[in-house]
Amino acid sequence: MRWLISMRYFLAHKRQTLVCIAGVTISVTMYIAMDAMMSGFSDKFIIETVESSGHILVNDEPRETQTPILQKVYTNPNSLIAIRGVKPREHVKKIKNPEGLMAKLRRLPGVTAAAPEVTGEVIVSYGTKTITVAIVGVEPEQQTRVTTIGDKVVSGGFSRLRSTADGLVVGYGVASVLGAQLDDTITLSSSTGGKTTARIVGIFQTGVTPVDYSRAYMLLNNAQTLLDKKNIINRIILRTDDYNRAEAYAKQIESIVAYKTESWQESNANFLKIFKIQTIITGFITGALLVVAAFGVLNILIMAVLERVNDIAILKSFGLSRTDITFIYLLQGVAIGLIGSAIGLIFGKITIEILRTIPIQLEGLVKADGLLMSERPSQYITAFIAAMIAVTIAAVYPARRAARYDPVEVIRGAH
């Protein structure tokens, strides 16, 4: 009986009910579509960055800065002898015994591969164009084990670094800015006075703008000579069995080795903060829409209660309890939430598929030929639960208000 009465009241205000359902539908659809879009761009950035730059970086910086022994002894204010103006000994930053360290790292649980790098900034010139590029000296065979940069080469080949004495693989953005093409010869100059010419043997495109527009690869020996870092390795790249656990692995590795170790999350912390802010903004927008939809439900149920005060009194006089009356009106709110959420889930799926087909060139933090949509079951579940909670809470007040009416007082007031 309670179900029949509730559904009868539910259908009594069709126009207002449809508006409330539409509000819930729009909120759910918007959340699913916006979250899929934000997740698509963040997933693209994370995957491409991780795959092209490695999971963990072991840098040439010591884990702790050592205080010179003379400074410890003779700069004490209570000491009889004091030394001022002590100049620290010039220290060449490098990783000591890199081959031995890499062999040790490869044996650690979770580490699947390790590769040496020497890095530095150089000025690249081609014709009248000049830009600053981060040069990375690598051993091609080892580099392709820790990153997928070889698979990102869209013109030429990464393996040509080995077969070409002066070979250079540059990012798509670097080549575009310079106006250079495959097999063109460009000039590289370092701040230490090193200068050389190199032939472009490959052009890679990861889709991540900071990488494509600022990075170039050359043979390890050639880079060491150019940067005046002969026989120096200043970075070791590690690949793990699960990049999501890179932070935990990095902490373990740093406690073992004497060098600062960064996970990809730490290296890209600023970019990850941007994506977190975007997620928060998405939540605020869809949350605001849900609040509006909830107020719509609240409004229509209050109107329904006020219009049917006499009916409520009659129902109570026939033996319906407060719980029954509460159930009747609460069920109407739940019905609006269920129908609106269900339609919203369907529309959300349709919206994602439509957005995927839109031909649009995007070039910002991530370069793409269309909108990147990342679809997860959690998006649908979250949207459904949030909508149901919001609408149900909105229905509680009018339902309890209806249950509090005293049939005797209502009948007296009616006369």
Tell where the protein language model's regions lie, with residue ranges.
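Hydrophobic, regular-secondary-structure patches
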Residues: M38-T132
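Short acidic/glycine-enriched loop/turn elements at secondary-structure junctions
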Residues: E90-K94, P98-R199, T225-L226
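Hydrophobic alpha-helical transmembrane segments of multi-pass inner-membrane transport and secretion
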Residues: K14-F41, K276-D311, V334-I343, I389-I393
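Mechanotransmission and gating elements of multispan inner-membrane complexes involved in transport
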Residues: P62, V174, L182, T187-T282, ...
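Short cytosolic juxtamembrane segments of multi-pass membrane proteins
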Residues: R401-H415
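Transmembrane alpha-helical interface segments in multi-pass membrane proteins
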Residues: I302-A304, N310-R356, T382, P398
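Short helix-loop junctions at transmembrane helix boundaries
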Residues: A342-A383, V396, R400-R404
